[in-house]
Amino acid sequence: MPPPAGLLPWPSPSTTRLTTPTPTRPPPRTTRVRPPTPPPPPPPYTRVRLPPPPPPPKTTLPPPRLEPAAPKPTAASTPLPPDTASNAASSSTCLDCVHFGKCSGCTHEVDLDKPPVLQEVASFFKVHGVGDFTFSRGRLSQWRCRAKLAIRGTPENPLIGLYQEGTHVVADIPECRAHHPSINAAVKLLRQGISELNIQPYDEDAGTGELRYVQMAVTTYNTSIPVDKRYEQGRVQVSLVWNSRDERSQNAEKLALLIEFLWRNGGPKSSVHLIHSIWANFQTSTSNIIFGHKWRHLKGERDLWERYGGVDISLDPCSFGQANTLSFNSLLHKLNKYVPRGSTVVDLYSGAGVIGLSVAASRKCRSVKCVEINKQSKMSFEKSASRLPTNLGCTITWHNTDASVEPVHWLEGSSVVIVDPPRKGLDPSVISALQKVALSERKAYKAKSSLAKVKDEKRPWILRAREAAVHVDNTSTEESNETWPETLIYISCGWESFKKDCKSLISSKAWQLENAHAFNFFPGTDSIEILAIFKRESEAGQKKRKKAKKKKAK
């Protein structure tokens, strides 16, 4: 019997220890005579009162691989939790997954608390003058709360998992150690439904079959149970990607049967309330794109809520959501401390506005502008913003436009800029705009900005941004056009692109890298999430640098 999903494999008993030879005849009676009573123990002063031998020095039992993997003497090892520092050999830092090697999800199975790239990251920040770099290892197993899984195989033996490295062969991963336990339980239920109802998994070569993919998204938002129980009792939003144009297609009857099976066995009336809601997505394309454009809500609650950074956030199945809920909350908690109270904030590449809304609620900002190119994020933003306190006193807007088109429009009037770009990093136009907000070029930017205001009506990108804008709070705030960003907060999921962008920003002498933190968003991989804080060089500092340069030239 296999171990329950999400748990370590049961150790197999050693047969050599359990098996003893059976004698053909009883041993001679002389060997079974009771031995004589042992003599009394020696006097206490001979042994008992002697002090026990001192324990071996700690240096003789170093945690295996801890010091070689951690950078020395950077601060990267300092913030690691005490249990990691003292018990690095503990199995808690090992993957212990039966699927490792077949599944492409994890690239290493030991030292999950120290991604291989960590030493390079710590060295980079040390070279650039960051003395308080920290690394948050987070939860090392059962951390993934969102998963997109391919479905292949046969009704009798469905394969639900990820593609093997470099192929389109699906590795079945029913006991994935990264998945939240509720995801593994929901996958098990789905597998049972596929077999019992004879659902045909998708055949990628022939383009036939019925069920192509499934997305599992866990919500831990449940105010009816204690806070410390909410994560482990998370419920799953199930999104089935069906190989048809819509719910009126020929095979739609099977889809309805599968949905009823899942809801009956995992819904609120089942013995274990596992499933939060069920959605269907209809996709007939032969490309590698997972989702089609048509979504249908079929069972359960329509809105999936999660608590991020102190605010309630609504996420549709088509919205982007962080896979590691706990680590993302840790990042938001750290980020908010770097936003001065009363700031005017612009959040570029904002998605559904999670970061902007969190900052608005926790830092009493005067205004927050969220800029996002994906129009599908608008509905999630509106729902989330509707739950903010009514007395917030902050003007919050969401703009559906491309931040890379004349980004100076968004930088002007903002004291804090937050950027959370995709893995490729910042657009060149955004980097250029951030470089040019140095104090020496304020006048040029003021003139350009004033000209832009006169030509608003002739610039369709501004009109589109205004039409798509969402205004949450009409509190009047006088934003001075004299304000330019003093703080830049950069969140990065791509280390190589961040290094390039960071060097571009600090080489211009307009920005100084002051703080940096890393988060273990994807244990078992070589990925790392970066939170970096840049400060614009002060006017006094800039003048001092120029004087020193002139003096050196003389």
Description of each model-found segment:
Residues 1-24, 36, 44:
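N-terminal chloroplast transit peptides
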Residues 130-154, 211, 219-220:
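Composition-driven low-complexity segments enriched in polar/acidic and proline residues
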Residues 152, 216, 223-243, 312-316:
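Short, aliphatic-rich beta-strand segments
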